[in-house]
């Protein structure tokens, strides 16, 4: 399973972004695959908050457009909504303690804990995830050799 961070969703819809083409191509390929893609609630809510915010987006989506994007995403048979399970707090606590971080990286630790708990790979363009050593993650815009 791959778990999607909010930045993947935002780049996929934001045609003004320099990362749009690469991330949209990556996401389209992932959606067409047999692999399960997990969308955490925090990523879905973050997408709605940021994609519709004129201070965050040059051309923000309307609420209806943002909801339609998520509806279309959740309609794929290989896309599931991801929520914390019984081990989440222990994993989150351990990640924050080992990385000696919290503050602005608390949500990153939450996403890392979700991915670890679900045996998944986190997909994000955010390099801060490298501080969580137990996490498997991939950056869709990273150059491949």
Functional labels for PLM-detected ranges:
Residues 33-34, 76-77, 117-118, 132:
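Structured helix-beta-strand junction loops
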Residues 73:
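Ligand-binding beta-strand-loop-alpha-helix segment within the catalytic cores
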């Amino acid at each position: 399973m791959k778990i999607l961070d909010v930045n993947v969703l935002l780049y996929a819809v934001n045609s003004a972004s320099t990362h749009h083409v690469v991330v949209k191509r990556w996401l389209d390929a992932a959606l067409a695959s047999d692999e399960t893609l997990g969308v955490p609630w925090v990523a879905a809510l973050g997408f709605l908050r940021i994609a519709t915010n004129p201070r965050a987006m040059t051309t923000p989506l309307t609420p209806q457009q943002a909801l339609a994007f998520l509806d279309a995403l959740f309609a794929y048979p290989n896309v599931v909504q991801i929520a914390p399970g019984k081990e989440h707090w222990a994993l989150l606590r351990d990640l924050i303690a080992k990385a000696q971080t919290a503050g602005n990286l608390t949500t990153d630790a939450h996403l890392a804990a979700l991915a670890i708990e679900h045996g998944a790979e986190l997909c994000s363009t955010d390099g801060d995830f490298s501080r969580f050593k137990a996490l498997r993650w991939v950056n869709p815009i990273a150059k491949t050799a």
